Amino acid sequence: MKLTFLGTSHGVCEPNRKCASCLVEAGGKNYIVDMGCDVMPELTNKGLLPSDITAIFITHPHGDHVNGLIPLVNQCSWCYMSADPLILLPEMSIRDGIKAWLETALHLPLRATLRFEQYEEGVIYDDGILRVEAICNGHMENSYSFIVTADGKRVLFTGDLSNGNGPIADFARMNKGEPFDAAVVEAVHFDPNLYLEPVRENPPKRLFITHYSSYSLEKCCAFKKTMAGEVPVVLLTDGYEVTV
């Protein structure tokens, strides 16, 4: 399973870092976790078209995780008419908002054959290559974290967690059983050093920090230094690629 981080910033863009999105490649297929930024330029640079995307998984409705759906759905509604990604949403109001924007701003109807599905907690996707389990978290209503399994590997994408105490309230509850091969964790809504205890209780093989800000960077670096020799920690930047 290969991960390419297309966007690693938090609620707003920072220099050289766009809002959240990750391309997941497994078994010759391409999937996307969150679309907080327009991923079309990055996909094009990788030689991918919307028709090459099998499924898209959105963790929660905030704009820094969904805004990139607008240009993708726009282009799939008039140019890439054969593109058929399954778009899995925590609430259908996201689709309704995109539909209204296309009709109002572009006078363009939403392509009727585009597939949007609302999911709830539990296994939300399994095509025999990639499996996604959604777990509720406390960030907001209809906010989820994902456990993505492919190629015999398990990766946790936290999405956004509870404000103030996400590592304790949410991450600790998810970080059970067989250690994750990788955990992709956010670090802007709380002190990232709150991860210390739950990470040490069940260390993932690798930990990737995303969705951090310039004002949380110092604390993220302190957390990474504390974890040295225990768990490899990477502060992600856009374009970072890793095979799990």
Task: Report residues per predicted region.
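Conserved beta-strand hairpin/beta-sheet module of binuclear metal-dependent hydrolase folds
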Residues: 1-46, 142-162
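Active-site metal-binding loops of divalent metal-dependent hydrolases
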Residues: 8-9, 35-38, 61, 137-139, ...
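Short, well-ordered alpha-helical microsegments
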Residues: 40-41, 95, 141-143, 164-167, ...
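Metallo-beta-lactamase
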Residues: 82-143, 150-151, 233-243
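Binuclear metal-ion centers of metallo-dependent hydrolases, dominated by the metallo-beta-lactamase
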Residues: 168-182, 191-244
